[in-house]
Amino acid sequence: MLTGSTSAPPVRSLVLSPRDSSELLSPTGPLTPASTKGAGTSALSSKIASVLSTSYADTEFREALFLLDERGLQNVAENRRKLRLDLQKEVIDSNGEIIHEFGKVAEQLKRIGYTIGKLNESYNDMRTQIHAAHASTASTLGEASQLMTQKRQIESKQKLLSTFKTHFILTQDEVDALTLTSEPVDDLFFTVLAKAKKISRDCEVLLGFEDQTLGLGIMEQVTRNLNHGFQKLYRWIQREFKSLNLENPQIGSAIRRALRVLAERPTLFQNCLDFFAEAREHVLSEAFYTALTGSSAAGLEDPSVKPIELVAHDPLRYVGDMLAWSHSAAVGEREALEVLFISEGDEIAKGIQVGREAEVWRLVAEDGEEMNIFDPVVALNQLVDRDMSGAVRILRQRVEQVIQTNEETILAFKLANLINFYKSTFSRLVGPASILVEAMGTLETEALRQFRSLARDHVATLQTEFQHTPPDLRPPDFLTDALEQLSAIMKTYETSLSSSGDDPEAEFASIMAEAFDPFMAGCINMANHATPPSKSIFLINCFVAARTTLSGFTFVRKYAADIQTKIEEEKARLVIAQYELFRAESGLDSLIEALDGLDIRKKDDVGKVATLEEVQPEALRQSSQKLDDFLPSALIDATEKLKNLQDSKLASSVIEEAAERFCVDFEHVEEMLLSADELEEQRRVEEDGDEEHSQSFRALFPRTSSEIRVLLS
């Protein structure tokens, strides 16, 4: 096998036959007589050709040459002769070593074969024993496998049962903590209650199975425990309410948590609120009575309290102090209840909504029927209102007594206005549909009724004064008093919340109907018995006084505008009266009237002037003379006529307007007379050319309109 190694091929290629090698390596060739020149040449040529034909690029040949080169042989005849032998000897030695080594390998293989035989015997023996053991333990292993399977199933069932019991069953300790009144309402109670509620919800899954016995049983047990738990919580909250101090700024978190949980039972929650409201109503009633009298209903005095009945020095202060106490108590009650019921967000509202949806009557309600959504703010307002109801009853009795015993008109209105202010305040605090607001509305109505009654009684007592105007035509005393009273009322109303409402003018109209209109009607009735212009002067004096009173208030602008209109109407009457007086006293009345219908632009009308009786020389002289007598004292006489008019500016305006109208009429008279003179002059010239004529109208009536305006200005 080893002769095929990498060194073998070059060795084989160099091994030549003895004949060939001797011939090749011999420098002279064979020396036999039989060799001829031709044969020797042929053999040598063949050898040379063979050598030359050998490719030096052949790998095996090159390796053979490389091996020869490594041996360091000299190219001598001795070495050439021994080369084959040495090579063969080396091959034989190598083969011998290989055979020796293979002998060792064969010996080792024999030992391995012996060992393998022993192993096969042991394996067969063990296999026989195993088959025998397996045959004897097969039934036992089957039973063990079944037992292991059963064990796994039982363990799975145990785990499921344990999980089921943990999730759906309350332990006895948990049931005791939930239902026994001897156990406290603490974190454990609320934890167990939450677990019971979760069990109740999850029982719906069990009820979905075909066999509902387990689900119904657990549901019944949990429901019973839940009911006992909520009853325990309900009674605990009632006990806490009895000792609860709302004035304490830090109300316990336990009671707030209990209320949030109890809200899931709306009926129990409402019963708690009713109980709480009754207790707070009694407490606040006692507190209000103590604030009024300084002692409780049982007669126990409180030295720290200043009794309102003793401190208040007038009815308005008395009512104001009672209303202020009620407002302060309502605000304090609301703030405390906000901490108690709303400080934790809308959890109570959510709980009540959940409880309502779970109630039986909710489930059987008609399809179209919807239950109102719980509003915590509205519920809080209602609770505050109920807490204050006892104090409100006492307040209402006391205020009604004050209103009924009051005999002052202004005080009655101030009381009504004060009550209206607190009505608006309570409406924002506890809502418009509350006992507080209803009581304030009733008291306000009662105060306004008393105000109207007193105002009407006052007007009735003044009926005898509504007969004749005062000699100096000034506003009567009853009007002055009424306007002072009205001014006080309007100032009170202006500071109230009502004046900033949507339509304060309409709201105040009812007050004006009682405190203003009757007195103005009385003045008008008095003026009807007077003669012009005294009637107008008296009415203007009354109207101006009323306008002065009303002008400072925006919510009576309509009344002020009506008064101003009436002043203008009476002023117009005074202007007419003064204008007629100017015409009569100046002596020009008949002349103005005669020329009134004539137009200066019409020649025919101008021609008629000379034919009028009023412009005849004698009549015209008398009119001119009377006018001259009138003008020096005209303004003084006119001012004297209006001396009772208290508004001097208005009197001057009346005289100016009357004088202006008189001057306009005089200008018309002057223009007509001048036109008549011109027309007469033209006629004379046309007839005879003689410019001399009788005395002209201007000569008979020399006054000019400019002079009149100066004298009457």
Curated annotation (Swiss-Prot):
The keyword Protein transport appears for this protein: yes
Pfam families, A to Z: COG6_C (PF20653), COG6_N (PF06419)
Domain of life of the source: Eukaryota
GO biological process per UniProt: intra-Golgi vesicle-mediated transport; protein transport
Predominant localisation class: Golgi
Region of interest (Disordered), ranges: 1-40
PANTHER family: COMPONENT OF OLIGOMERIC GOLGI COMPLEX 6 (PTHR21506), CONSERVED OLIGOMERIC GOLGI COMPLEX SUBUNIT 6 (PTHR21506:SF0)
Name of the protein described by the UniProt record: Conserved oligomeric Golgi complex subunit 6
Source organism of the structure: Neurospora crassa (strain ATCC 24698 / 74-OR23-1A / CBS 708.71 / DSM 1257 / FGSC 987)
Upper taxonomic lineage: Eukaryota, Fungi, Dikarya, Ascomycota, Pezizomycotina
